[in-house]
């Protein structure tokens, strides 16, 4: 049926291909991922991630072929992230509105600030990635670093007080609670 997805594709110029009893070819897009997962992790994995644009057809086809082939559940938990916006528009290599990590690092932005910005929105929400956002992430990290220094100073001055212990234990508990709620790192921060 023409609507079926391809498990094996005919060879194309300048693409790798393999000889098989059915003729030369290459794995279809969906089977590539299933085969790599099977080889490295086995027939069932705990977490599989990807963009929301991959739910259909890619992830549904991965499920169909893997569960049909092995008779076992393919993935226990899916994490589908929303699209990343750059300066208010969907990031697209073809539109030229994207940054590479190398570009950002060469402009002096720290990996830590970039990571913080990317974690500042829940994975199910779109994030508008801007250079101003990285600067704001720098400021947020500076506040966190200053708080840690102050907490260490208080601990050194007063010893391991019950009040300080309760404060930091409460902060940790709220962070863990947020992360336990659909991996909501942004709420934890």
Where are these regions (language model features)?
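Alpha-helical recognition segments enriched in aromatics with Gly/Pro capping
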Residues: 1-154
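Helix-loop elements that line ligand-binding/catalytic pockets
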Residues: 127, 133-189
């Amino acid at each position: 049926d023409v609507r079926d997805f391809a498990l094996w594709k005919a060879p194309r110029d300048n693409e790798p291909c393999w000889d098989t009893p059915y003729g030369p070819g290459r794995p279809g897009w969906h089977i590539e991922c299933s085969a790599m997962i099977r080889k490295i992790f086995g027939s069932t994995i705990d977490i599989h991630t990807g963009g929301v644009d991959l739910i259909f057809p890619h992830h549904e086809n991965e499920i169909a072929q893997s569960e049909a082939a092995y008779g076992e559940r393919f993935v226990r938990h899916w994490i589908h992230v929303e699209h990343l916006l750059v300066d208010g528009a969907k990031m697209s290599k073809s539109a030229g509105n994207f940054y590479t990590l190398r570009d950002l690092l060469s402009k002096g932005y720290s990996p830590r600030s970039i990571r913080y910005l990317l974690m500042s929105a829940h994975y199910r929400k779109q994030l508008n990635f801007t250079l101003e956002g990285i600067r704001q992430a720098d400021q947020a990290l500076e506040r966190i670093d200053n708080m840690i220094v102050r907490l260490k100073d208080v601990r050194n001055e007063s010893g391991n007080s019950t009040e300080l212990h309760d404060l930091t234990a409460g902060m940790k508990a709220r962070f863990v609670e947020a992360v336990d709620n659909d991996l909501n790192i942004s709420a934890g921060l």
